[in-house]
């Protein structure tokens, strides 16, 4: 029998309550972003985890139940690209039924987020969506993501999610010097006043696959100064201790913007 939901959560070494669990449902993705899964490494011959070796949906649910019994409240579904995983909506439906889990979110590139799937995900119990989008202009988008379809497909996915009832959609943009720092202001303008929360992420070291260099990092300090040249933003207090993004708001009431630091 599964243990009852914990009244207190375990803490990490910094005294922060462990309330979130991130579950990667696949290592595959239809994007080949240069800072994450560059094609020269993740090409046709790359050995992804065989599908029959992935955790089955029932195994994922069991893990979620164990963590819920330890005090976890939030589940984040990730990949790769999680929408590649078959029966994703059924998985979310099962997780939503777990006692103690009160928030389920998903990080996606939104390229598969059709109107029907957005509604199905909402109906299954998905609470929040985060979309990865690093540029708005066609050339930079295709260069960064190494895909053959237009950026409008991602923007349509975001709109489909909004129409399905998802609120406060988060937009994550990784900024790399020499690649897409010119996209910062266009992104800030585009999502101003939309209800979406734009979050800029410093270029991060993900091991040996992206040839990370410190001088390619555009710091949060630089990003804030750049945006403030055109659109005034002000810092606000975090929602809770240990929140990942540093929160700011447009001074004119146009919504929230965040910064996630890597160094």
Language model: regions and residue ranges:
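Radical SAM enzyme [4Fe-4S]-AdoMet core and its adjacent flexible, acidic
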Residues: 2, 139, 151-155, 159, ...
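Conserved alpha-helical substructure of the radical SAM core
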Residues: 2-79, 83-102
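Short beta-strand/turn micro-motifs composed of small residues
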Residues: 25, 108, 261
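A short, compositionally biased micro-patch
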Residues: 26-28, 124, 251
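Residues that line or immediately flank small-molecule/substrate-binding pockets and catalytic motifs
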Residues: 40, 79, 108, 133, ...
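Flexible, active-site-proximal loop/turn residues at the rims of small-molecule/cofactor binding pockets
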Residues: 42, 81, 135, 175, ...
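A short acidic, helix-capping loop that chelates divalent metal ions and anchors anionic groups
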Residues: 43-47, 137-144, 207-211
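Radical SAM/AdoMet-radical enzyme domain recognition
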Residues: 57-76, 84-197
